[in-house]
Amino acid sequence: MSVADVKKGVEQKMQRSIEAFKNDLAKIRTGRAHTGLLDHVQVDYYGSMVPISQVANLTLVDARTIGVQPWEKNMVAKVEKAIREADLGLNPATSGDLIRVPMPALTEERRRELTKVVKSEGETAKVAIRNLRRDANEALKKLVKDKEISEDDERRASDDVQKLTDKHVAEVDKLVQTKEAEIMTV
């Protein structure tokens, strides 16, 4: 294993941490409608649970309403039930074969709770990134111990890993700020 392998590996893992954090943020409901909110809803489709996107077309009707149009008429009731039971605080209404999912307005208290959740998720992501930095630094120390690289190379590589860490932590902070602003916008 070389210094380049360590740096490349840690950067890829940090990027995956950022992607996982973005996915976690997407699950947090803001006052605005977006189809990604229903990505994790599972529907009973002939005995097996499948994501809602595999049995219905998801569209935005307006800024506060998601339209869900199941491809099969017999799925309308099942899809509506799945959305209602998804624990997202949503109350779908069916008109014909279109299910409208209005986004309820968030109360001030609920907005504050959600910003706390966002901050907490952000801290978790930053801890994961710092743990990756620690693992990379340990791998570099092992390379020095095994006499594969010099201490100067290790120090330079450590500085590079620190720069990567700072960059990814700053990205998490930026994502947290953006999501908080989105939540607090009435």
UniProtKB/Swiss-Prot annotation:
InterPro entries associated with the record: Ribosome_recyc_fac, Ribosome_recyc_fac_dom, RRF_sf
Any GO molecular function: ribosomal large subunit binding
Domain of life: Bacteria
Keywords: Cytoplasm, Protein biosynthesis
Entry GO CC: cytosol
Any GO BP annotation: cytoplasmic translational termination
Subcellular location: Cytoplasm
Broad class of the protein's primary localization: cytoplasm
Listed Pfam families: RRF
NCBIfam families: frr
Function text: Responsible for the release of ribosomes from messenger RNA at the termination of protein biosynthesis. May increase the efficiency of translation by recycling ribosomes from one round of translation to another.
Family: Belongs to the RRF family.
Protein name: Ribosome-recycling factor
Species of the source: Burkholderia vietnamiensis (strain G4 / LMG 22486) (Burkholderia cepacia (strain R1808))
